[in-house]
UniProtKB/Swiss-Prot annotation:
Organism this protein belongs to: Gallus gallus
Function noted in UniProt: Tubulin-folding protein implicated in the first step of the tubulin folding pathway and required for tubulin complex assembly. Involved in the regulation of microtubule polymerization or depolymerization, it modulates microtubule dynamics by capturing GTP-bound beta-tubulin (TUBB). Its ability to interact with beta tubulin is regulated via its interaction with ARL2. Acts as a GTPase-activating protein (GAP) for ARL2. Induces microtubule disruption in absence of ARL2. Increases degradation of beta tubulin, when overexpressed in polarized cells.
Keywords noted in UniProt: Cell junction, Cell membrane, Chaperone, Cytoplasm, Cytoskeleton, Membrane, Repeat, Tight junction
Protein name, per record: Tubulin-specific chaperone D
Principal location: other
Region of interest called Disordered, as start-end residue ranges on this chain: 1-20
Family note: Belongs to the TBCD family.
Length: 1019
């Protein structure tokens, strides 16, 4: 859509609204494209010379392989033949360089999907492969940025070949070359290649690190070259600085090589060098680096050095749950067996644990604990895994010290990063059985706090990753411990997980909590009503936040174990949340939960909220006012349903507290400024809910105060921010409607004449304000007035609104006020009803229907534009909607008030708008057009060419026709050119579309389907 033709204002949407989460996944059963891939690989020899064809075939292969990123195991049966086809090209000495590199590119794409560790095993590793692969690597240019896939795959291939069980010296033969010069031994050639590629900046560096880890651990290489290689890496580390790009690249390669080496090397081989490497690593001070990858590699190396220092043995003291079968876990007999196994394991002699722990371990553990507080997740995650691995090799006392140090991460003086890292580490310990049952009582409070950790920091919040980690910790506990160990904490953990699954702000946390709850239900079998809750709050159900708050929560609260914890969480943690959307959802959830615990709401929650509603904290005050409104309304509805007094659940103190909210805020001038943008709609909502609750405040002075607030809010709209205006306006209008219906009507169903005259006159006078927003507010306010307030003043109100819809030089850009005036006219018509022979001061009748239609039809031609674009589109859209509402109202009551001329004008203008170039307005016009055409209870009279229209737009296609698609809409619209009544208007609309900047409408709009003489008949 062209810039000049966009919907200038669009719809006003809340920026903080949670984005819709759509989970789309490909659940595949096999590698269905195997034949297509075979054909692609077979065509490489024919297309490599054409760059365009080469790019096409590569992109096709990438698209196919990317489908299997989440299910790469489906490729396993096909990897061998794919590799063989590509290796045939690579081994062919006649393959041109372009084809050679293209084959390696395809190998890399496969490796990227399946992972190099598995793909590595498939490489041929015969003795005869060593020399050719070495020669191919030597022929490569390490600086060629176009062929990095070739170098990466060759190094991986070499890392597999170098595992051949023969002394490399046998490959050297005659060490003298033909020219008489000494030739470099094969061992040194491979090492030089590895060293060369450890200092490059591309992907080959990763493969070089893998090569080093496989090559250096060979017995012959270890004896002759390991010490020298480690000296070289430590020297390179010492000379490099992470403050330069070159130094960062070098350090990355060295750290990868060392980490891989200490992972794959034997402990007895690496132990003599571990202390030296650790000392060098300390001197590098990687914790001060801004490079996340360097800090992560440093953490990985530190933990592997720590594992080298301690013996590779499983701790005898670790907690062993025993049977892992889900079915057995739920059987009482199995539980007894497991308890016996645990007792035996706990009583085993610990004679093997008496060994000295090197002093370096303290340094290693300290660095890992510091790593848990790193600012980046991948560093914390690496540190957490290191803590788990090393703790499993420590004696029981030292391991308990590590757990104690971990628990220090969970003080509120620590950052959210420390909490997150601590949760990950505790989960690792629990998963490995290293967190003994004696520590569960210390860890459970941490879980409960972490599951609700949410803090605002600047313009965003922190804590979502922490809550996610807490769910992982709960999941790990479910798998690690016998149900009997967690029995004392079951209610706390289950309630916390339910609350996180239903009320968390972030969808990933809700889903993580749901998964953790499911794991606990399956593994523990002790969560109250676990299966029932899982059915309602499964992984997919919790994806929709509104559904969680308003529907799922009500179902779960039906189980008494969860009712009060859920209510308390909303009151304590959510109504004061930094996100206004969460606050509003929480108050609506409280409304829905009130029938589950009405006495608790009335006697505990409401008295707790009333002081908060006039407190000092803005967010708490906002949420508390809304919560008071929703809970009060719910209690009154419940009392009414049970045939009790409206005030059954309220005492005098509560009623007085509700009345005092507005007076207190007004006296403290809290309606001013940015805070007022929250307070005004909140108190208006309170007014609306108290009015709907029929509170006994009739004649009370508070009613005047509420009316003042509504009027002042509408007058203050120009001062509100753009984001808040709509909400303030809607809240005030809704409050006005409810207030009038409850407190301004007497026993005879009429209004006090003085009050009516003052209110209506005041609102009509505001319609001529020089501020557009004031016109908008009071237009909608007039539209919201009940029938008894409009009685005797209808013509005056309609005339005032008609003037707002007129375009004058002074207010040509007041599109929003014209839109809202049209909306108000339609609302008023529906409020007062239709009576053909009635008074024009009370009903829509024959005396004023023509004037109403004239006002609405006049606005269908509003094409005002300004810097925001086609703002007149808002007016046209509102006019079309109002025309539809008024017409259907008349048709259903007194259809004779609609004459043929009016109906023709309506349908013709709608037909013109259906040829609109802006998709949104075209779709709306088309929808209104078809609604009037196919309405049949009773049908709209006097529609020109009804039979032809029903043939062009069959009733069966009314809902499926996509008006947003120009290619679908215009072929239908152009057929109206054959109908004389519509020709001029449709051609006018098509002309605008053809001349517009939008390519699709310009192409689709020409009347190709209208017949050869359609245009001629017009003239």
């Amino acid at each position: 859509m062209a810039v000049g033709e966009t919907d200038g204002a669009g719809s006003e949407e809340s920026g903080s609204r949670e984005a819709d989460v759509i989970s789309r996944g490909n659940i595949l059963e096999s590698f269905t494209e195997s034949q297509e891939v075979r054909a692609l690989l077979g065509n490489l020899r024919t297309v490599y010379g054409d760059p365009v064809a080469q790019e096409v075939i590569v992109e096709k292969f990438i698209v196919i392989m990317d489908k299997y990123q989440e299910q790469p195991h489906l490729l396993d049966r096909h990897l061998e033949w794919m590799m063989n086809m590509l290796l045939d090209i690579i081994r062919d000495s006649g393959s041109p360089p372009v084809l050679f590199h293209l084959a390696f590119k395809f190998l890399y794409i496969i490796t990227k999907v399946r992972g190099y560790k598995l793909f590595l095993r498939l490489f041929p590793h015969e003795v005869t492969d060593l020399q050719p692969v070495l020669d191919m690597i030597v022929d490569q240019n390490p600086k060629d940025c176009e062929t990095w896939e070739t170098r990466y795959m060759l190094l991986l291939w070499l890392s597999m070949i170098c595992l051949i069980p023969f002394d490399l010296a046998r490959f050297d033969g005659n060490i003298l070359s033909e020219e008489g010069h000494t030739r470099m031994p094969t061992m040194d050639r491979i090492l030089e290649i590895a060293k060369c590629y450890l200092v490059v900046s591309d992907k080959a560096r990763d493969a070089a690190a893998v090569l080093v880890s496989k090559f250096i651990v060979r017995p012959d290489v270890r004896q002759k070259r390991m010490a020298d290689f480690l000296d070289w890496t430590l020297s390179m580390l010492s000379k490099s600085s992470f403050q330069s790009m070159e130094g960062t690249v070098v350090m990355n390669g060295m750290l990868q090589a060392l980490a891989q080496l200490f992972k794959h090397g034997k402990r007895e081989d690496c132990l003599p060098y571990a202390a030296t490497v650790l000392e060098c690593l300390d001197n590098c001070k990687l914790s001060e680096s801004n490079q996340m990858v360097l800090r992560k590699l440093g953490m990985k190396l530190v933990q592997r050095l720590g594992l080298t220092f301690v013996k590779p043995k499983v701790a005898k003291w670790r907690y062993q749950r025993g049977c892992r079968s889900l079915a057995a876990n739920l059987q009482a007999q199995s539980s007894v067996m497991q308890s016996q196994k645990i007792t035996v394991a706990a009583n085993e002699a610990e004679d093997d644990e008496e060994y000295d722990i090197p002093g370096e371990i303290e340094n290693v553990v300290e660095q890992l604990l510091v790593g848990l507080k790193d600012k980046d997740t991948i560093v914390r995650w690496s540190a957490a895994k290191g803590i788990g691995r090393i703790t499993g090799r420590l004696p029981k006392e030292l391991a308990d010290d590590v757990v104690g140090s971990l628990l220090d991460c969970f003080s509120f003086q620590e950052t959210d990063n420390a909490w997150h890292g601590g949760c990950l580490a505790l989960a690792e310990l629990g998963r490995r059985g290293l967190l003994l049952p004696s520590r569960i009582s210390d860890v459970v409070p941490v879980i409960l706090k972490a599951l609700t950790y949410d803090e605002k920091r600047g313009s965003c919040s922190v804590g979502s990753n922490l809550r996610d980690a807490a769910c992982y910790l709960s999941w790990a506990f479910a798998r690690a411990y016998d149900p009997s160990e967690l029995i004392p904490f079951i209610n706390q953990i289950s309630s916390a997980l339910v609350i996180a699954a239903v009320f968390d702000r972030d969808v990933n946390c809700r889903r993580a909590a749901s998964a953790a709850f499911q794991e606990n239900v399956g593994r523990q079998g002790t969560f109250p009503h676990g299966i029932d809750i899982l059915t309602a709050a499964d992984y997919f159900a919790v994806g929709n936040r509104v559904n969680c708050y308003l529907t799922i929560s009500v179902y779960i609260a039906g189980f008494p174990e969860y009712t009060q914890p859920m209510i308390d969480h909303l009151v304590n943690m959510k109504i004061n949340h930094w996100d206004s959307v969460i606050r509003e959802l929480s108050t609506k959830a409280l409304h829905n939960l009130t029938p589950r615990a009405p006495e608790y709401m009335a006697n505990v929650v409401l008295p707790r909220l009333l002081p908060l509603s006039v407190g000092t904290d803005l967010h708490t005050r906002h949420g508390a006012i809304l919560a008071c409104a929703e809970i009060t309304h719910a209690l009154c509805k419940l009392a009414e349903e049970n045939n009790r007094s409206i005030t059954y659940y309220f005492n005098g103190k509560s009623l007085e507290g509700l009345k005092q909210i507005h007076q207190e805020l007004c006296s403290r001038q809290l309606y001013r400024g940015l805070g007022g943008e929250l307070m005004r709609p909140a108190v208006c909502t309170l007014i609306e809910k108290l009015s709907l609750s029929k509170m006994p405040f009739k004649g009370d002075p508070i009613i005047e105060g509420w009316q003042w607030l509504i009027n002042d809010s509408l007058r203050s709209l120009p001062l509100a921010s753009c984001a808040a205006r709509q909400h303030v306006k809607e809240s005030a209008v809704s409050a006005l409607s409810a207030l009038c219906n409850e407190y301004y009507i007497n026993e005879n169903g009429e209004a006090d004449p003085a009050l009516q005259g003052e209110l209506v006159t005041q609102y009509i006078s505001e319609l001529q304000s020089t501020e557009q927003m004031i016109r908008c507010g009071f237009s909608l306010a007039l539209g919201a007035l009940p029938r008894f307030l409009l009685k005797g003043r209808l013509q005056q109100v309609l005339e005032g609104l008609r003037k707002v819809t007129l375009i004058t030089p002074r207010d040509v850009s007041f599109a929003e006020s014209r839109r809202d005036a049209l909306i108000a006219i339609a609302e008023i018509c529906q409020t007062v009803g239709v009576k053909g022979e009635g008074s024009q001061e009370e009903y829509i009748c024959k005396d004023n229907v023509a004037q109403i239609y004239a006002t609405l039809l006049n606005c269908v031609t509003d094409y005002t534009t300004d810097s925001r674009g086609d703002v007149g589109g808002w007016v046209r859209e509102a006019a079309m909607t109002s025309l539809m509402k008024v017409t259907l109202l008349l048709v259903q009551n007194e259809a004779e008030l609609i004459n043929a001329n009016i109906c023709k004008q309506i349908m013709c203008w709608l037909a013109q708008q259906s040829a609109e170039k802006i998709d949104k307005f075209r779709a709306h016009a088309g929808s209104v057009f078809l609604t009037l055409l196919h309405f049949d209870s009773p049908p709209v009279p006097h529609i020109p060419h009804r039979e032809e229209l029903e043939r062009i737009f069959p009733r069966s296609e009314a809902e499926t026709l996509n008006w947003n698609a120009a290619s679908e809409a215009f072929p239908r619209i152009t057929q109206l050119l054959a109908l004389p009544a519509y020709q001029y208007y449709v051609l006018l609309g098509l002309s605008v579309s053809v001349g517009g900047l939008t390519e699709t409408t310009g192409v689709c709009a020409p009347p190709d389907n209208a017949g050869p003489n359609a245009g001629k008949r017009l003239f």
